[in-house]
């Protein structure tokens, strides 16, 4: 402790710990965020590269999804962790744009730090950034955004394609984008407030080895990765109004709990106990059969004793289903997921109102795997995608890519507006905010100009990843947008330049709306808002105090 008071630095606190403040901590934070952003930078865009992440036991993941990469990293620095959480939040809320949100946040921080070094107070910078963000969002909504109604189903397919372009299924995006749009349109529902929703979770994705990616299937109905419990059971039950019971309980012989002791003096009593053990579960099965169930799905086991009853009653029984699957099936068919058959009086009952309805339940075969399909569910419609691929790693990555595309199409359908992709929004905002900055008379002008410059990191990174000359392409792109914003209202051709962005395959500037490179407006707005919030949170930090861990206490009995 004595060395603490002898420490020459006057700003050391009177606690066992280390204090870093001023420029040191800002530089540290910027370096940490740049390090995190540089990991994902090269995976941005249609020609972005993948990352292989190996964990401590040797399992590896190959992916190009920003949120997945950052979740698997073990980030030590607190500022870096803020960016990881930022990517995860973007993934949860929008599903796509995780990489770009991290890159924008780190670039904003880097430029803000330069301004601080030039003696501009962080509060002034934050105010300037907030003004810039407000103007940017207004410009996106008023000028760049287009309503989907005017563009039709083709737009949704293009949005799904744009989301897939950077992923493993990018080469087959024509095939998969149609599949994604059809799957989502099939699960359209209306909630209690009368709003139309497209729940991504209602689209079940199953993975089966073998064949190629383009032999994946879209199946109407809910696909369960299970098979019937006995070969003697019917493999198909149809005819409309098929009654389904969803159970979260064990249909196995009841065994006495561990540690229960029963003293008996007559061997016949032992036989009675055995019979009663079997009787308890048989009574349950009878009640389920009497309620009229034709299909029984359970998360636990069904033993041979019960299977015999089900087979005789021509009931299809499926055991060891995932609870999450049963929850969704219960929601789609209107069934109740029963976890206990006891009622309030303590007696066991099974009401027919617990059953759900559908049109058909069938066991279908896909390559070597079999699965149960539940078609024509009564409450909400559902659809399933069965992915085919060479190995686990490619199937996992395909599933992540599909999830991103489904989320993006869902957001577009619910919000109804799209903007051109390919760096178009960022270039347009760059020109607009640069001009806007000159109209602001205070010191915030510098912050707004830096905000504008930071946005160019997206088109620059896209061009660099595509092995193109970024300086030339971005300069050309800016000249198009400058022309569009200075054009007179009657000059339609020059006004249409506002939709121009990068075509990274051919290295040209093209009209993105005609090229079909589109993104939901909400994705762009949300990523700018989130990136700014993360940047502000880190920029406001001017001191970091690391408290030393307490030394382990000595054990008095340790000689």
From Swiss-Prot:
CDD domains: TCP1_alpha. Keywords: Acetylation, ATP-binding, Chaperone, Cytoplasm, Nucleotide-binding. It comes from the Eukaryota. The modification N-acetylserine is found at residue 2. One of its GO terms (molecular function) is ATP binding. Its main location: cytoplasm. It is found in: Cytoplasm. InterPro entries: Chap_CCT_alpha, Chaperone_TCP-1, Chaperonin_TCP-1_CS, Cpn60/GroEL/TCP-1, GroEL-like_apical_dom_sf, GROEL-like_equatorial_sf, TCP-1-like_intermed_sf, TCP-1_chaperonin. The keyword NADP does not apply. Belongs to the TCP-1 chaperonin family. This is T-complex protein 1 subunit alpha. The gene is TCP1.
């Amino acid at each position: 402790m004595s060395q603490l008071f002898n420490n020459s630095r006057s700003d050391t606190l009177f606690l066992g710990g280390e204090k870093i403040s001023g420029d040191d901590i800002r530089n540290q934070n910027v370096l940490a965020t740049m390090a995190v952003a540089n990991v994902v930078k090269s995976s941005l865009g249609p020609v972005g590269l993948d990352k292989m992440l190996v964990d401590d036991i040797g399992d590896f993941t190959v992916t190009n999804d920003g949120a997945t990469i950052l979740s698997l990293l073990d980030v030590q620095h607190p500022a870096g962790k803020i960016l990881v959480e930022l990517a995860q939040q973007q993934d949860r809320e929008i599903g796509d744009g995780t990489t770009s949100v991290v890159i924008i946040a780190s670039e904003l921080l880097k430029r803000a730090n330069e301004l601080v070094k030039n003696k501009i107070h962080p509060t002034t910078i934050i105010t300037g950034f907030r003004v810039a963000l407000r103007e940017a969002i207004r410009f996106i909504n008023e000028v760049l955004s287009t309503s989907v109604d005017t563009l039709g189903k083709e737009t949704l397919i293009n949005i799904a394609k744009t989301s897939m372009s950077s992923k493993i299924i990018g080469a087959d995006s024509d095939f998969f984008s149609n599949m994604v749009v059809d799957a989502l349109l099939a699960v359209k529902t209306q909630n209690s407030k009368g709003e139309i929703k497209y729940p991504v979770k209602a689209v079940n994705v199953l993975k089966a080895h073998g064949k190629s990616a383009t032999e994946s299937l879209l199946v109407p109905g809910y696909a369960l990765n299970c098979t019937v419990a006995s070969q003697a059971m019917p493999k198909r039950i149809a005819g409309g109004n098929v009654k389904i019971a969803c159970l979260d309980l064990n249909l196995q012989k009841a065994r006495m709990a561990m540690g229960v002791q029963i003293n008996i003096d007559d061997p016949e009593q032992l036989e009675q106990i055995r019979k009663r053990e079997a009787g308890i579960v048989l009574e349950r099965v009878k009640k389920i059969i009497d309620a009229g169930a034709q299909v029984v799905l359970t998360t636990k086991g069904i033993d041979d004793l019960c299977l015999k009853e089900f087979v005789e009653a021509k009931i299809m029984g499926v055991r060891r289903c995932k609870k999450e699957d049963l929850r969704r099936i219960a929601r789609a068919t209107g069934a109740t997921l029963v976890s206990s058959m006891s009622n309030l009086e303590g007696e066991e009952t099974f009401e027919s109102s617990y059953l759900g309805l559908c049109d058909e339940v069938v066991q279908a075969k896909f390559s070597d795997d079999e699965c149960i399909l539940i078609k024509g569910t009564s409450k909400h419609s559902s659809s399933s995608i069965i992915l085919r691929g060479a190995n686990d790693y490619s199937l996992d990555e395909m599933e992540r890519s599909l999830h991103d595309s489904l989320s993006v199409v869902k957001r577009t359908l619910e919000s109804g507006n799209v903007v051109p992709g390919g760096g178009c929004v960022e270039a347009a905002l760059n020109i607009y905010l640069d001009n806007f900055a000159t109209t602001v008379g205070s010191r915030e002008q510098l912050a707004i100009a830096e905000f504008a410059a930071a946005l160019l990191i997206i088109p620059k990174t896209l061009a660099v990843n595509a092995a193109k000359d970024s300086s030339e392409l971005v300069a050309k792109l800016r000249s198009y947008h400058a022309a569009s914003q200075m054009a007179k209202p009657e000059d339609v051709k020059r006004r249409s330049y506002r939709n121009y962005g990068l075509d990274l395959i051919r290295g040209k500037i093209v009209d993105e709306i005609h090229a079909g490179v589109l993104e939901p407006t909400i994705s762009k707005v949300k990523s700018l808002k989130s990136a700014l919030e993360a940047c502000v949170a880190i920029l406001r930090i001017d001191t970091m105090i690391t408290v030393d861990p307490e030394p382990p206490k000595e054990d008095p009995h340790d000689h």
